[in-house]
Amino acid sequence: MLLREYGEKDLEEILRLFYRTVHVVAAADYSEEQLDAWAPAEADREKWRASLAEHFCLVAEENGKIVAFGDADGGYLDRLYVAADFQGRGAGSLVAGALEEYARARGAEKMTVHASLTARAFFEKRGYKVLERRRVERKGVELTNFLMKKIF
């Protein structure tokens, strides 16, 4: 598996991976209405483009296909998504580990994340602790997530 920095040419593939991952992998934990609010069929490409350009973003590739991506802003892990057919194969750990190392190398003493119900166990296995169970609103729809922290 190849780990590399995100390039703007990756945007469309990342948006497809994000949509499919949310709607397939998180479907056991969230309603269809919640999934649509979290990952609408039509993404705001300019918002995504700007956000990914501002953050340190990595993609994991297998045979030329993006199978995972994640991005961090300092000590905050903003997004981490793994393709539905690559769950449990190490892609998420590869990306998360590299983002944590990047933050640590730049002086961060901790990493925080807002983890979904679906991702909570993944982050707990990586040493993150739940600080708070949260209810957030997306497009008028309430979703549950967890503020989590890992001390380096």
What are these regions (language model features)?
Residues L2-R16:
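A short beta-loop-alpha structural element at the N-terminal edge
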Residues L15, Y19-E46:
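Conserved GNAT-fold acetyl-CoA-binding loop/helix
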Residues F86, G90-A98:
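Conserved acetyl-CoA pyrophosphate-binding loop and the N-cap/start of the following alpha-helix
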Residues T112-H114, K129-L147:
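Conserved catalytic-core motifs of GNAT/GCN5-like acyltransferases
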Residues F123-E124, Y128:
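Conserved active-site tyrosine of GNAT-family acetyltransferases
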Residues F56-A68:
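Conserved beta-hairpin
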Residues A96, A103-S116:
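Conserved GNAT acetyl-CoA-binding A-motif
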Residues A43-V59, Y76:
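A short helix-loop-beta-strand connector motif used in the catalytic cores of GNAT acetyltransferases and
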